Swiss-Prot record:
The lineage of its organism: Eukaryota, Fungi, Dikarya, Ascomycota, Taphrinomycotina. The chain crosses the membrane at residues 28-48, 241-261, 397-417. Keywords: Membrane, Transmembrane, Transmembrane helix. This is Uncharacterized protein C18B11.03c. It is found in: Membrane. It comes from Schizosaccharomyces pombe (strain 972 / ATCC 24843). PANTHER family: ALCOHOL O-ACETYLTRANSFERASE 1-RELATED. GO terms for molecular function: alcohol O-acetyltransferase activity; N-acetyltransferase activity; phosphatidylserine transfer activity.
Length: 447
């Protein structure tokens, strides 16, 4: 890594999200944490500053967003009064569905970073809102890790709300850290699949993918959770069937979507799974940035039984098959990394615009940030976390996000595209959520 990097060219993965935001295909992520103390500015500002000085990407922004190659460049300072806001009478669900609709972080104001924090829920919940161009889902928990450290340290009196950014160098983008160049086979396959020629899609019948995206993106998000007791049951089930938590959530989500949209009959469902790429990169595991791969799993001719007594058998079959295939993909990430490399062969803005003329690429998307533990004996604790991508996904109409706190609940958010009928969208979200929780409870009992 360069000894000191004030600015660099944006990578293609970063540019993909930049162009989405320019085209009002909003690409923001939120990760919130509920703390055990009141987050007044006197205690919060020093804690946020602690995160800023330890994570150089928090001091960066995108310049020249309309050019072919935007620049990631450090600011000199950040005014905390401009990035820390209080709405302590609001809850995260109403905040997400109201304040964050059509919300995007401004590329035109060159004094601001591409993130903000809002304090909600009687000053106990801190919502970190950030642009996907510079940060992935895994960056959210890292931010709260440093804020928690800052809250546990001796307090610093601020004479001014304006603070300097980190002196650490900007981390390199994903494409500089791993080989993403697609093979000839990968290139030919991509060209053939998108050629529009007869049989170019193969012999597989179409999958359910919902309607085409509509700009500006809009969605409805609901939050829900399962208790630590249920989490323990799922952990035991995971051991018994040798499948990961993500695999279990995947299978239950697929069943829930099927019962919500298909009623009966066979259907093809495609699931996109976000994969934290830090495990494959020679960078510190604690580095904030946009380091994410995607893996797509195809479920062909899916027609589960309508009988509740068959739920567990179907779920186990789905979870074990998916877990096996995902483990194989993770053992050799070359296929996933090549998908990032393909972005160098397309006009991203043109690709995004054309995506609004056809159905989305997949049925659903799931992102599980994982299991997070914090010091149990500290004076300040994180009691709960939530994670959402509250704007409609370009890739799928249904998006499930998961995050778990040690000795606490496992929290979910479900975002569903909103095509203008918000009431109907809300009803569909409730239907999928209720089915998800019902199946999850049944399959985890007596595990």
């Amino acid at each position: 890594m360069d000894t000191y990097m004030e600015e660099r060219e944006a990578g293609r993965l970063e540019i993909y999200s930049v162009k989405r935001n320019v085209l009002n295909m909003f690409s923001i992520v939120i990760v919130s944490a509920t703390y055990s103390i009141s987050l007044d500015s006197t205690v919060l500002y020093p804690a946020v500053y602690h995160a800023i000085v330890n994570q150089p990407m928090l001091g960066a922004r995108i310049h020249n967003c309309h050019s072919k190659i935007p620049i990631v460049k450090k600011l000199k300072t950040i005014d905390l009064d401009k990035v820390v806001k209080y709405a302590d009478d609001q809850k995260v669900d109403s905040f997400c569905n109201n304040a964050l609709q059509n919300f995007k972080l401004c590329y035109d104001d060159e004094t601001l970073p591409l993130w903000m924090v809002y304090v909600l829920n009687d000053k106990s919940e801190l919502v970190f809102i950030y642009d996907h161009s510079l940060f992935d889902g895994g960056s959210g928990p890292l931010f709260h890790k440093y804020v928690l450290e800052g809250l546990q340290m001796s307090k610093t009196n601020f004479s001014s709300s304006t603070v300097p950014v980190s002196e650490l160098p900007l981390p390199k983008n994903l494409e500089k850290l791993i080989d993403v160049h697609p093979s000839w086979f990968c290139l030919m396959k991509a060209l053939w699949t998108n050629s529009g020629l007869p049989f170019s899609k193969g012999f597989r019948s179409p999958s359910y993918k919902g309607h085409a995206p509509v700009r500006p993106f809009s969605s409805h998000t609901i939050f829900f959770s399962i208790s630590n007791a249920v989490v323990k049951n799922i952990k035991q089930l995971s051991k018994n069937i040798d499948a990961s938590f993500t695999s279990i959530f995947y299978s239950v989500f697929m069943l829930s979507i099927y019962y919500a949209i298909a009623k009966n009959g066979k259907v093809n469902l495609d699931m996109l799974i976000d994969v934290n790429a830090r495990r494959f990169l020679p960078v510190a595991k604690q580095t904030m940035g946009n380091y994410v791969f995607s893996y797509v799993h195809h479920l062909n001719g899916f027609q589960p039984s309508q009988r509740q007594e068959d739920y567990k058998h179907t779920m186990v079959d789905l979870a074990t098959e998916f877990s096996h295939r995902l483990k194989a993909a993770l053992s050799n990430p070359r296929e996933m990394s090549q998908q990032i490399g393909l972005l160098s062969y397309i006009d991203i803005e043109d690709y995004l615009l054309k995506s609004c003329e056809k159905t989305r690429g997949n049925t659903a998307e799931i992102s599980n940030l994982g299991y997070f533990s914090f010091p149990a004996d500290s004076s300040v604790k994180i009691k709960n976390m939530a994670f959402a991508q509250p704007c409609s996904s370009l890739s799928a109409p249904f998006v499930l996000n998961v995050i778990t706190v040690a000795d606490g609940p496992c929290s979910f958010s479900l975002s569903i595209f909103d095509d203008g009928n918000t009431e109907q969208t809300h009803e569909l979200a409730i239907k999928i959520r209720d089915k998800f929780l019902s199946i999850l409870e049944k399959v985890s009992m007596n595990s």
